[in-house]
């Protein structure tokens, strides 16, 4: 099992319980979506999984290794196997597409203005190949600030792949995009996932897209996993279990 989340809890200083009992597992090669209403704990969960936030209890195992209780070196080693793409892209706007992709190779994503000169030709060629894979071969030297939202997310995907991740966290990857562009991004993500047998865990508010592109759904509500089911589970059952409402009738 690539990822195991076992009874994970997180409470903030204002005593808000963001996660009260989150437990699920993800197998190698799965495309799993985490769904739920706003405030369900999805973003907190993803921040814990990418290492930017510590949980208050429970355990997270990546390839059998306890992530939370590991020493600093082991945590860093685990984090290098996890790539993340974000709703807001998290790119360096004034840098080129190539520079942003190469940025993934730097410690803690620290940016070097002369980053392309910092790496050898092989790394630069790999970055360019990834930009080609996501459909941006003609944008290698283009500053990110000149790109559309969909193109920026393609750069972000290439950057995440530069880490050769075993697990890709997609945190609301199409929430800021129009429906057509969002679907194109998810189609690209699914193609890459299937080609590379990559494991994808996606946080999404869009049930329809989650069902279409995922193999499994994890439903969160009030910090607790209330659903773990195949993606083709009838929508009315998902709505009742996760959102506590019935499917709207025409």
Model segments located where?
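Catalytic Walker B motif of ABC-type/P-loop ATPase nucleotide-binding domains
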Residues: 168-171
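Conserved ABC ATPase signature
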Residues: 143-147, 151
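Helix N-cap at the start of a conserved alpha-helix in ABC-type nucleotide-binding domains
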Residues: 179-181
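ABC ATPase NBD Q-loop/coupling interface
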Residues: 59-77
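Conserved ABC ATPase "signature" region
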Residues: 113-138
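H-loop/switch region of ABC-family ATPase nucleotide-binding domains
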Residues: 204-205
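Helix-to-loop junction immediately C-terminal to a conserved catalytic motif
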Residues: 50
